[in-house]
Design a protein with these regions (language model features):
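Beta-strand-rich N-terminal accessory domains
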Residues: 157-321, 331, 362
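C-terminal capping alpha-helices of c-type cytochrome domains
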Residues: 24-25, 115-157, 852
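Beta-propeller domains with acidic blade repeats across secreted/periplasmic ectodomains
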Residues: 158-163, 394-774
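Gly/Gly-Pro-rich "capping" loops immediately C-terminal to redox-active cysteine motifs
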Residues: 33-37, 47-100, 116-126, 473-474
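The canonical Cys-X-X-Cys-His
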Residues: 32, 38-48, 95, 119, ...
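Acidic, Ser/Thr/Gly/Pro-rich low-complexity segments and short DxT(G/T)-type signature motifs
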Residues: 392-394, 771-778, 797, 865-895
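Detector for the c-type heme attachment site
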Residues: 44-51, 65, 122-124, 140-141, ...
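Short, surface-exposed alpha-helix to beta-strand junction/turn motifs within ectodomains of secreted
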Residues: 791-835, 869, 884
Length: 895
């Protein structure tokens, strides 16, 4: 015992075979925790002893012990239950081959049943062997006393082979003979920063927080590893060999008429500035009031023909444009142009500058004062940077903007077989190479089609691309996690995208095929460079308003920077996180609805009604499909901290006062069964050219790599409806479907961060119907005053009786609850006995009549699982799956 206790307190050094003593060491437990959290394991697996919350995977506390214990698993291939040792080999298999053996629940209501095959298999491309070992050492600490592994395990860091050129460094973004502009979060700046790399090896960062340059460096431009790995959220690194000349406060900060530095810290603090986040979260002054008092705004940037940006912003009555150039010899020139309605001051930070000169205005006591002007005038400030310039290594090749042929190939089986209804097939669209001919991470999360057939594809980290005449071409450089796109013209030359920091209008104003104008439509909301602060949308209504969704934040290092409202993960850092918002045609920002958690889908149905898809979690018992209506509350109270005058301590926003104000959802999407992370909708408006699903909403799931069909109805003023599986085994996480002019369905997918069952990090697949084959399936389910009417896509065979068919149906039901715990178990689960059934005269539907249906209060606000267990012989010679299923949410019974 004494020996074991001593080992528990030690830091264990472990040297790799042949490792040199001089190699860098790292703590594998600490690294394992980072990987565990960044891959989202913490969401599905509890690490707390005896945690009662409902999770989709087993509790890891007390699982991997010093003396390995037994645990029970189920082998899906044959249904066999057996016991295995929870040792290192089992751990490795549970990560690499997670579907080979499913853990059996050891406690609670699900004790004795196997967890679902939800966790994807993590290949080495997603979690390296080195990181896998680190996670092992981390999970070994999740036990009591001597059964736990050491709290610190020091390992040797493996040296990466030297790169022949910057193009060989993974995720390195070099600069050739054209200026490059990227939206990134850099250390020491806000998450809304714009990084600019010049061809001469000089780079700088313009930060909209101060409307000023904040960082200057030479050498390598950027390396986007931190943004392209797992869930991102860490500050982006500078390029290889970078040397910093200037960083910290603003270099040339505009001043208000009162002489104060323009500072938007309240809505965009510096990356990982916990102190500022806590300050403004608990401050009673509202964001809208701070914006009005500051009376300034960032307006975007315009690119010259060589790619150099001119930054546009407004301070009071003055609209200004600023350009920055850094010469080979380190001379910095900042030009400010504008028609000044009032005198404009700038505070200059002179640290690291020499030979400061101005052309126009007066520089005195560190303030550059520009006079009122009746016309547009340009004034310049120049200075020399201290220190020598660091050269960039020569590139073996330059950029190539030549359009690339779009290649399509039959979709190969992924981690699971691709299952689609008979008559449907899938093609994979091969992603384009980047400008330097390298394979790139290409996550197509925004797709739209112009009237002339141009397809616009926005991505998380690879920029915005267009497909014209069967060829890919890059339209706009790196956007910051773009998750949606709307086309404003007929050709795809004028678009609006979402990015984490803002809603942006992007324009090709000179017709050369490349975007040159980036207009900030809206950034009047909080963005803290948090990995979970996604901006979903936008979508546009007929009046020209743009609607978008702001996810809650998740700080993996602190529970004080966001208000989690008693929950374990997601919370608001203020600034309308957890809200649906809109921006009007004249640029006015308007909060629209609140109570959102992690909404990942939004769209207008063919009748013009707005809907959104919500992800399961705190205050959201399971994922759901809901009409999005102005002024309504949707369940998660964290976002209420953005209401006027509210702070986390305000009694007015505590859950008991809001739980009965919930806008009820229309359709539950059962967690672990159909959807864990539902994405964007696409309605079938093809007029039958995609099959028999006219008017239905197609929604994918990012985790399960599935495609679903949703049909809703309104009964007695209540929304409700059914969801039916359409496809399984897509290549990655399904996020953005869109119907193309040829009536096929193009599906943008991403598996990064929230690993998907499909297994791939990214994918773009096209689903095509052969135009003739209609498989037998459940088309949808509707409510009847006596039960449920199950509608089929093909008529039942003439010899099938109602009683015989009803005997093959199994109907069960349950309900979910919404509280601060992560998700909800299935409450009051029961099997429904059928008192009768009736087949319609056209044999396209059957009405199932549960015993006692409608009597008492036990029927409503429940989800009903309708399972046709054996379809053999039911639909003649029509192709059909062995079993059919649908889930129906019942909120009201027809009278």
């Amino acid at each position: 015992m004494i020996m074991k206790k001593a080992m528990k307190m030690m830091a264990i050094p472990m040297l790799a075979t042949g490792a040199a003593w001089g190699q860098e060491q790292y703590d594998a437990v600490e690294r394992g925790k980072e990987v565990y959290e960044s891959m989202g394991c913490i969401v599905c697996h509890s690490t707390t002893k005896d945690d009662p919350s409902a999770k989709t995977g087993p509790n890891l506390h007390g699982l991997f012990l010093t003396d390995p214990r037994e645990r029970e698993v189920v082998i899906p291939a044959n249904g066999e239950k057996k016991k295995v040792k929870a040792d290192r080999a089992y751990f490795n298999d549970s990560i690499r081959k997670s579907w080979d053996a499913l853990a059996v629940s050891e406690k609670g209501a699900t004790k004795g049943t196997a967890y679902g095959a939800i966790m994807p298999m993590f290949a080495t491309e997603v979690i390296s062997d080195e990181d896998l070992e680190a996670v092992w050492h981390y999970v070994r600490t999740m036990a009591d006393g001597y059964a736990a592994g050491p709290a610190q395990v020091m390992l040797q860091k493996k040296d990466a082979p030297a790169a022949a050129s910057p193009l060989d460094i993974p995720n390195e973004e070099p600069v050739a003979d054209r200026t490059r502009v990227f939206r990134v979060a850099l250390p020491g700046t806000s998450g809304r920063t714009v990084a600019v790399g010049q061809p001469n090896g000089m780079s700088y960062a313009f930060d909209p927080r101060f409307l000023s340059v904040r960082k200057i460096w030479s050498g390598g431009f950027l390396n986007l590893k931190e943004e392209r790995t797992a869930r991102g959220g860490n500050a982006v690194e500078l390029g290889s060999g970078a040397k910093i000349y200037q960083q910290g406060g603003p270099l040339l900060a505009p001043l208000t008429t009162g002489g104060e530095v323009v500072d938007f810290e309240f809505k965009e603090p510096d990356v990982n500035d916990s102190e500022a986040q806590i300050k403004y979260l608990n401050d009673k002054v509202d964001l809208v009031d701070r914006l009005a008092a500051l009376n300034s705004e960032y307006l975007g940037h315009q690119l010259s023909s060589s790619g150099e940006p001119s930054f546009r912003f407004r301070v009071g009555k003055n609209s200004l444009t600023q350009t920055v150039r850094i010469a080979d010899d380190g001379v910095l020139v900042i030009a400010v142009a504008g028609k000044l309605a009032e005198a404009q001051g700038f505070r200059l930070r002179t640290d690291g500058l020499a030979d400061v000169k101005v052309d126009g205005g007066e520089l005195k006591d560190g303030v550059w004062q520009l006079p009122v002007s009746s016309g547009v005038k340009t004034h310049t400030l120049s200075a020399r940077l201290a220190g020598g310039v660091v050269a960039r290594p020569a590139l073996p090749r330059g950029e190539d903007w030549t359009p690339q042929p779009l290649t399509k190939k039959p979709s190969a089986p992924g981690k699971k077989p691709l299952e689609l209804p008979a008559g449907y097939s899938a093609l994979t669209w091969v992603a384009p190479l980047d400008l330097f001919g390298r394979t790139q991470l290409f996550e197509p999360t925004g797709i739209a089609v112009a009237k002339n057939g141009t397809i616009v594809v926005s991505t998380r980290t690879a920029g915005v691309w267009r497909i014209r005449d069967g060829k890919w071409s890059l339209f706009a450089e790196n956007a910051y996690e773009s998750l949606g796109v709307v086309i404003e013209d007929d050709k795809g030359d004028r678009i609006v995208i979402s990015q984490k920091p803002e809603i942006t209008r992007i324009i090709d104003s000179d017709g050369d095929g490349r975007a040159d104008a980036f207009v900030t439509l809206c950034d009047d909301f909080g963005f803290h460079a948090n990995y979970h602060e996604y901006t979903h949308g936008p979508v546009r209504d007929k009046a020209g308003n743009y609607y978008f969704l702001l996810n809650l934040s998740h700080d993996r290092n602190s529970d004080k920077t966001s208000w989690r409202a008693g929950g374990p993960f997601m919370g608001s850092m203020e600034g309308y996180r957890g809200w649906a918002c809109r921006v009007t045609p004249d640029g006015k920002f308007e909060p629209y609805a609140n109570g959102l958690r992690s909404p990942a889908g939004i769209g207008f149905d063919p009748e013009g009604r707005l809907w959104y898809a919500e992800n399961q979690g705190e205050y959201v018992g399971s994922s759901k499909w809901v009409p999005l209506e102005q002024g309504k509350f949707y369940g998660h109270i964290s976002g209420l901290v953005s209401l006027p005058g509210m702070t986390p301590e305000s009694p007015e926003i505590q859950y008991p006062l809001w739980k009965d104000k919930l806008r009820k959802g229309a359709v539950w999407l059962p967690h672990g069964k159909l959807a864990n992370s539902p994405g964007n909708p696409a309605w079938d408006t093809t007029g039958g050219k995609f099959g028999i699903y006219k008017g239905q909403a197609f929604i994918g799931d990012q985790t399960l790599s599935t495609m679903l069909r949703v049909v809703t109805e309104k009964v007695n003023g209540e929304d409700q409806g059914s969801v039916v599986p359409f496809g399984h085994g897509l290549s990655s996480g399904v996020m953005r479907p869109v119907f193309l002019p040829d009536a096929s369905l193009l599906i943008g997918q991403t598996g990064r961060g929230w690993a998907s069952n499909g297994g791939d990090q990214d994918a773009l697949q096209q689903i095509i119907w052969d135009g003739k084959t209609v498989s037998a399936d459940i088309n949808h389910v509707s409510a009847d005053k006596t039960g449920f009417k199950v509608h089929f896509t093909k008529p039942l065979a003439a010899d099938v009786s109602a009683d015989a068919l009803a005997a093959k149906f199994k109907v069960s039901s349950w309900f979910y609850t919404n509280d601060e715990k992560y998700g909800s178990p299935e409450h009051d689960k029961r099997d429904e006995s059928l008192a009768g059934a009736e087949i319609s005269p056209d044999r396209l539907s059957i009405t199932l009549r549960p015993a006692g249906f409608g009597e008492g209060e036990k029927w409503l606000v429940r989800i009903y699982y309708i399972n046709l267990t054996d379809t053999a012989g039911l639909f003649g010679d029509a192709p059909v799956w062995k079993a059919l299923e649908a889930y129906f949410t019942l909120n009201s019974i027809p009278k």
